[in-house]
Amino acid sequence: SALYLLSAKRYGVPVRICHSHLSGADRGLCVELLCKLLKPILNKVTTDMFACGRDAAISLWGKENVLNQRVYILNNAIDTAQFSYSESIRKQKRAELGLGTETVYGTVGRMSYQKNSEFIVQIYNQIRNHKKNCKFLFVGVGEREESVKELAKEYGLSDMLFLESRNDVNQLMMAMDVFLLPSRFEGLPIVLVEAQCAGLTCFVSDAVTKEIHVNPNVYYYGLDKGPDEWARFIIDHENSEFDRKDGMDSIVKAGYQIATEAKKLENYYMRAVEKKCI
């Protein structure tokens, strides 16, 4: 967006917003170098600094701007009603997928280096070594798809269902019991907001910001641990007493309701335009 903001400043556009989505943790050398080059430019041409969370704000705008409250944090909000847990939808979707009473693990996201997709397969393979009555729903496509499917085939994971891109992610989350997100890096992953709204027990890497930790059944674990250690940790902590029906209320109270955030953003735009255009 740096080029667009430069042009906007050149032609006298009074309100110029730039939104940071990624934190600086482990995002790769090329991206890191690009960000370092663009930071001073963006700080000069941006009138209103936005970010999806505190870590993403510090990464692009710097700690001083965050401490001085110059950065507007706009939560990655969702339509919470769509992800509110429903026992009837769960039963219907599980029947549709041929699932019974087994523990259903799952993930949603691009099959990519960032999402650590092959590692997810390795974790589930280890889970299967300790536990037989289970299945895995892998929702998403991406550049690592062939590699991921080959690895699952190599391990003989016929119970790992690849569902590709779907428009019923909310219902699939209700069919799941456990959600995995061992990403190498993230900004503030909206999929984890959705998973918590659906009341899922979640296991995420320590590269994911704890700003998004809302429900008590969300567990962080280190990327320095191997797949067997992850599998044992998951099995030891997956049986949560958290009532999945409370997921939506928790997410709404934490500020991730789309209607509320959209209204806040609308009000911000109106104030910014009035302040700088009058």
Specify the residue positions occupied by each region the protein language model found.
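A short, histidine- and acid-enriched strand-loop-helix "catalytic/donor-clamping" loop
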Residues: 2, 11-31, 47-48
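Donor nucleotide-sugar binding/catalytic pocket of nucleotide-sugar-dependent glycosyltransferases
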Residues: 44-88, 220
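A conserved mid-protein helix/loop that constitutes part of the nucleotide-sugar donor-binding site
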Residues: 103, 107-126, 143-149
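Short hydrophobic beta-strand element within catalytic cores of glycosyltransferases
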Residues: 201-205, 210
